[in-house]
A protein has these predicted regions:
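Bacterial N-terminal signal peptides
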Residues: 7-16
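Bacterial N-terminal signal peptides that target proteins for export
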Residues: 1-7
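Compositionally biased regions
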Residues: 3, 16-23
């Protein structure tokens, strides 16, 4: 539970509200606190794998949080970025060497291999590796062991673990670079809602929160679903799809 405790404590410490120690002792927190496993229990294994989402659930997480990008054939998979050289062993695959390329994603030039250039079957031949070896070097012992999971597989895990544990395990997906993916004919909204509907997640009461740093995909989702939507914000800058706005606006 160590990493989940740290995440919960950090969330409280970084909140915009400040109370004194005496006030905290006099008035305990009210309401229901949920524990969200950001990218799974990523302090212990390479992030965004079924193994590490399962680990987080075993540690008591209420929600597992996948970042979602799309494949060439329109399947949602969990990766921190659509450029996957930092999170998989793709650079070691000679058969994919010619697909290394440079793209501009949300105004930033990136060189590597991108999920949208591969089918799901091709991505399933890859194995995950630690994204931040300088910070989580122990996780490197697990490099090469785990597949890239699909969103469907993550939802199936949450359903199975809910039944096994007697707890409701929710999902807290983030759409990554949605305006970019929409621009290349791979919008998130259709496959995202189709997968959630398959598992019965259609009402506001469902254990689902859909989050994004962008604006327009949340607006599109608002007209198509009753599920809860979360607008993510940075301390500075603008949404990638709304440069006319700053996050405080």
């Amino acid at each position: 539970m160590t990493h989940l405790h740290l995440l919960l404590i950090a969330t409280i410490l970084l909140s915009p509200f400040s109370i004194s120690e005496s006030q905290a002792m006099e008035k305990p927190l009210e309401g229901h606190v949920i524990v969200i496993a950001h990218r799974g229990a990523s302090g212990e294994r390479p992030e965004h794998t079924i193994a590490i989402y399962s680990r987080a659930i075993d540690q008591g997480a209420d929600y597992i949080e996948p970042d979602l990008v799309l494949t060439k054939d329109g399947i949602l998979v969990a990766r921190h970025e659509n450029e996957i050289s930092e999170t998989t062993d793709i650079a070691d695959k000679a058969e994919f060497a010619d697909r290394k390329t440079t793209k501009t994603i949300d105004g930033q030039k990136m060189t590597g291999w991108f999920t949208e250039d591969f089918t799901l079957a091709e991505l399933k031949t890859l194995r995950a590796k630690e994204r931040l070896p300088q910070l989580r070097s122990a996780n490197m012992a697990y490099d090469g062991q785990f597949e890239i999971p699909t969103f469907d597989e993550i939802l199936a895990l949450a359903k199975a673990q809910s039944a096994a544990t007697g707890r409701t395990i929710g999902v807290y997906p983030e759409t990554k670079h949605p305006s970019y993916f929409a621009s290349i004919g791979l919008p998130h909204e259709g496959p995202l809602l189709a997968a959630l509907t398959k598992y019965g997640h259609v009402e506001k009461s469902a254990p689902v929160f859909i989050q994004s740093f962008e604006v327009e995909n949340l607006k599109a989702l608002r007209s198509k679903t009753k599920l809860r939507l979360i607008q993510l914000m940075d301390e500075k800058g603008s949404p990638a799809d709304r440069k006319d706005l700053t996050y405080p606006q």
